[in-house]
Amino acid sequence: MKIYRVGGSVRDELLGLPVKDQDYVVVGATPEDMIRQGYRPVGKDFPVFLHPETHEQYALARTERKIARGYKGFAIYATPEVTLQEDLARRDLTINAIARDEAGNIIDPFGGIADLQAGILRHIGPAFVEDPVRVLRVARFAARFGFQVAPETFELMKEIVHTGETEALVAERVWQEIAHGLMEQHPSRMFHVLRECRALARILPEVDALFGVPQPAHAHPEIDTGIHVMMVIDYAASQQYPLEVRFAGLTHDLGKGTTPPDEWPRHIGHEARGVELVMDLCERIRVPRESRDLALLVARFHGDVHRALELRPSTIADMLQATDAYRKKVRFQAFLQACASDFHGRPGFADQPYPQAEHLSKALQAANSVDAGAIAMQLGQSHAGDTDLPMRIKRQVYAARVGRIKSLLSNP
């Protein structure tokens, strides 16, 4: 039995990056051998075991054979006769098919080190086309490392899309890869790669539709809506904003993709149109509730936030209520981060001030100083038995909040 460290940990080590999870391949062993040595079986689709002390994953060397569409359509063959090279050959890219033995020696049968040095993402063999998830993974690695995709690998990615294999992707896996890509240092790179191999139109057609849609040049020097959205998510990444903010940045302008061309470059009503598109996208790829809810709010209200300095106190109070800012203060700050990213995601605007965010934060603080409980108690005593009492309390609290915001704006 021989044990090799493989995959991402070896790759990242060679790149001088922090190593997180470590995966191992075991050659020349059976499941019974592993169990006898104290390893705990956890693999459902193929033999994977947890080390009895470190709890790191150890998988038996295996080969795979395509038997059906999709990334789960494989027959697994794992026996002691499977060699390390055969196991490495089933992997997606050369840079992910490097191993290190227990003595520290590197095994690199497919030229992965040379591709790391050259900054190239290259597939290992023709079996690359059998797993549509690899299209997303290659795009994600492009965003992570800034590497170029080898031309021949790009052609295979296009083939995967053309044959309809991406249609078999499981929604949750699509979201998982998109989420990972959004959290990279330059997430726009992922979407440019997906668009270049024509996968973006299949996976996120609402985002793909934004490219080529013009905006007013005086407000958007980049003009192209798709380019703008890419700048927004890159800005959010540069600020290390969380996933929810980055996803909201990706989807905030989806409504512009449905503007009739004869109305370009204006996009009146795109916020309201975008809400339905965001909801449909989130349902289709199973976006988690936290990311979905923030994206919906940003799509609907980002224009109002940009105009915050011009809004009446009552309009600001309405927005705070509609965004549930009184109860969800942390989410409201994420909401403002996404809107700020929209503002900064334009050529020449990255370092410009965005006072709207602080303006609305102070407005929320002022409105929150209203003691709704005290108002309810006072009205409950003076209007006992009034069937309209709940609505009366609501109106009184609202008026008090508007008053506090008005006072703030009068004395900045």
UniProtKB/Swiss-Prot annotation:
Q: Which SUPFAM superfamilies match?
A: Nucleotidyltransferase, Poly A polymerase C-terminal region-like
Report the coiled-coil segments: none
**Its catalytic activity?**
a tRNA precursor + 2 CTP + ATP = a tRNA with a 3' CCA end + 3 diphosphate; a tRNA with a 3' CCA end + 2 CTP + ATP = a tRNA with a 3' CCACCA end + 3 diphosphate
**Can you supply a Gene Ontology BP term from the record?**
RNA repair
Q: What is its EC number?
A: 2.7.7.72, 3.1.3.-, 3.1.4.-
Q: Which residues are noted in the entry as ATP-binding?
A: G8, R11, R91, R137, R140
Top-level lineage group: Bacteria
What keyword terms does UniProt attach to this protein? ATP-binding, Hydrolase, Magnesium, Metal-binding, Multifunctional enzyme, Nickel, Nucleotide-binding, Nucleotidyltransferase, RNA repair, RNA-binding, Transferase, tRNA processing
GO MF annotations, alphabetized: ATP binding; CCA tRNA nucleotidyltransferase activity; cyclic-nucleotide phosphodiesterase activity; magnesium ion binding; phosphatase activity; tRNA binding
List positions binding Mg(2+): D21, D23
Domain HD, by residue range, is 225-326
**For binding CTP, which residues are annotated in this chain's numbering?**
G8, R11, R91, R137, R140
- Which InterPro entries is this protein grouped with? CCA_bact, HD/PDEase_dom, HD_domain, NT_sf, PolA_pol_head_dom, PolyA_RNA-bd, tRNA_CCA-adding_enzyme
Name the needed cofactors: Mg(2+); Ni(2+)
Does this entry carry the keyword Lipid biosynthesis?
no
Misc. comment = A single active site specifically recognizes both ATP and CTP and is responsible for their addition.
- Known PANTHER family for this protein? MULTIFUNCTIONAL CCA PROTEIN
HAMAP family assigned to the protein according to its UniProt record, in alphabetical order: CCA_bact_type1, CCA_bact_type2
Q: What does this protein do?
A: Catalyzes the addition and repair of the essential 3'-terminal CCA sequence in tRNAs without using a nucleic acid template. Adds these three nucleotides in the order of C, C, and A to the tRNA nucleotide-73, using CTP and ATP as substrates and producing inorganic pyrophosphate. tRNA 3'-terminal CCA addition is required both for tRNA processing and repair. Also involved in tRNA surveillance by mediating tandem CCA addition to generate a CCACCA at the 3' terminus of unstable tRNAs. While stable tRNAs receive only 3'-terminal CCA, unstable tRNAs are marked with CCACCA and rapidly degraded.
Q: How does it assemble?
A: Monomer. Can also form homodimers and oligomers.
Q: Which family does it belong to?
A: Belongs to the tRNA nucleotidyltransferase/poly(A) polymerase family. Bacterial CCA-adding enzyme type 1 subfamily.
Q: What is this protein called?
A: Multifunctional CCA protein
UniProt source species: Nitrosomonas eutropha (strain DSM 101675 / C91 / Nm57)
